[in-house]
Amino acid sequence: MSIHITRTRLRSAAALALLPALALTACGSGGTAGTTTAAAQSPAPTDDPVAAVRKVDSVAALLPADVRRSGKLRIGSSVGFPPGAYYPNGPGKAPAGQDIDIADAVAKVLGVKAVRQDASFETILPALGSGKYDVGTGNFGVTTQRLKTVDFVTYINDGQGFAVKKGGTALKKKVTDLTQLCGLTIGTGAGTSFETTLAEQKGVCAKAGKKPYEVKVYSENAATLTALQQGRIDVIMSTINGLRHQAAQPAAQTTFLGEYHRLDVGFAFRKGSPLTQAFQAAVNELIEDGTYARILKKWGTSASAIDASRINPPEHR
């Protein structure tokens, strides 16, 4: 017996109107007037640790000559997963978040301009191979499967976690084994490591003699929290930092159930990209000069700090 995976896309005007709220209710998304109000009352932090970052010639010299000449890096960015990247003032306005700050700081160290294009999470990694983007950002976890086709330069340690509706009874304790999800409906993001994990482990419930879990996959963050609030899913699987941030927002009405599986998170590149060494050196420069720590403190993610950036580390086990 296998799980059933439903792929859902919510792109209605109502859902899109709620995206500013989601940005502040976290890695999931909202669909209530309460979340909209919360967004208006929760602006992004105003401190700017990136402002003081300057070009480091020895690091910039690691860039390929064509990138140095153009002075630009094309970044495919998945925006909408706070505290990583979101629109605090609504779509079409300037994005903010940990990933935005780190990418902008890296670009300044390298002496180039970050030309950012908002893209759906599941489209970014395939687009790297086609040359559409030089680098991808979107809280991409480093997994064994992804390392077959993509190169990574790490900048934080995050991973997989679960959250439920506050006061719900479907799941009350930290998930340490996916058999705890048997018989439940899980909502998660399209093209994510969460979707992959749930699909790869689809047989655990049958082996345990239990009813399989069902997975509903959403391309819009706005749909995930709405589904939880309306009782169409029992639990959300998403990023540790995102779900923790979400649960801290009263309007979200969620409870974070803790970490399930830690993952290094990195900038993503096409396999064999000549940009990886320059990015690694730039991240390490930011770690050494203290900018990195200030960015993470700003976004409340200091517990996810790394000591040094690595290229293509193995997946955590």
State the predicted function of each range.
Residues 157-164, 244, 248-284, 302-317:
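Periplasmic-binding protein-like
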Residues 49-63, 193-209, 255-256, 286-317:
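Ligand-binding clefts/hinges and TM-proximal coupling segments of bilobed small-molecule sensing domains
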Residues 36-137, 289:
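Extracytoplasmic small-molecule ligand-binding "clamshell" domains
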